[in-house]
């Protein structure tokens, strides 16, 4: 009885992994961008990039993180503008 449960589990696992999509299967599928080569570097799409939340009034530079903005000299103390 135990042997048949183990065999059944292996068969179900094999069927489940065979049904999952792989990079080679998805490469030709419409609407799917899949990197199927080794060492490929993925870059964020334009809509995935974070939008800047902070902007320096003096030099017009935009920042995503508040720490970068305040280290830059935000709130009127811009280090880039020479003030």
Curated annotation (Swiss-Prot):
Induction trigger: Expressed during multiple necrotrophy, the late stage of host plant infection.
C2H2-type zinc finger locations on the chain: 54-77
InterPro entries, A to Z: Znf_C2H2_type (IPR013087)
Annotated compartments: Secreted; Host nucleus
Assigned GO CC terms: extracellular region; host cell nucleus
GO molecular function, one term: zinc ion binding
Key words of the record: Host nucleus, Metal-binding, Secreted, Signal, Transcription, Transcription regulation, Virulence, Zinc, Zinc-finger
Function (record text): Probable secreted effector that translocates into the nuclei of host cells to reprogram the expression of targeted genes by binding on effector binding elements in rice.
Protein name per the record: Host transcription reprogramming factor 9
């Amino acid at each position: 009885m135990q042997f048949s449960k183990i065999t059944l589990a292996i068969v179900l696992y094999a069927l489940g992994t065979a049904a999952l999509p792989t990079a080679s299967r998805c490469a030709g599928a419409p609407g799917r961008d899949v990197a199927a080569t080794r060492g490929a570097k993925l870059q964020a799409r334009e809509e995935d990039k974070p939008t800047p939340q902070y902007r320096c009034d003096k030099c017009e530079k935009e920042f995503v993180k508040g720490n970068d903005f305040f280290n830059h000299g935000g709130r009127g103390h811009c280090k880039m503008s020479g003030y």
